Amino acid sequence: MHLFHLCLIILCSCPTVQASKLCLGWLLGMDIDPYKEFGATVELLSFLPADFFPSVRDLLDTASALYREALESSDHCSPHHTALRQTVLCWGELMSLASWVGTNLEDPAARELVVSYVNDNMGLKVRQLLWFHISCLTFGRETVLEYLVSFWVWIRTPPAYRPPNAPILSTLPETTVVRRRRPSGRRTPSPRRRRSQSPRRRRSQSPASSC
């Protein structure tokens, strides 16, 4: 198994920090959390059960359908696009290595061990990464973080004191356990200042670029 880890590290070319975390951090047991820079943690993701996450194939199809142009572009769109791109590449390299091992390893028991390890261990971590970054791009990072905290609160609360159903990300504003609320008071506009509509003021406000 150590040889398998070594082959994976050599074959998985990782030009960014995010992919290096995926390929090296977990395999070598380094204390590196690939979610920390996005405000989450591996522990927070671990509260979601394994069957919560769609298959890698479904997640890859979703990423391709929604963000293919940005993922294939040479432009930097956002840290989530970069992390998603590198996770997809690393999974492709992992599958290539698994196929090579499956073809060239003669011992059926050893071959089954490698396949099971990839599917059960690395597969789950890749599914978690893909789900997290796709969800952040789709719903917004703050919404996803609120959902993770809400699910953590829900699952840690005794059944007698919590709602019967877990929070759902797509309906988070209505079902979240922990959510920020805007102040209900209406702000009164000040009559003493008027925004200038001069051409110079309009030219100074350049729109932000987005992918």
UniProtKB/Swiss-Prot annotation:
InterPro entries: Hepatitis_B_virus_capsid_N, Hepatitis_core, Viral_capsid_core_dom_sf_HBV. Sequence repeats lie at residues 183-189, 190-197, 198-205. Residues 183-205 are annotated as: 3 X 8 AA repeats of S-P-R-R-R-R-S-Q. It comes from the Viruses. The keyword Lipid biosynthesis does not apply. GO terms for molecular function: DNA binding; RNA binding; structural molecule activity. GO terms for cellular component: extracellular region; host cell; host cell cytoplasm; host cell nucleus; T=4 icosahedral viral capsid. Residues 1-19 form the signal peptide. Homodimerizes. Belongs to the orthohepadnavirus precore antigen family. This is External core antigen.
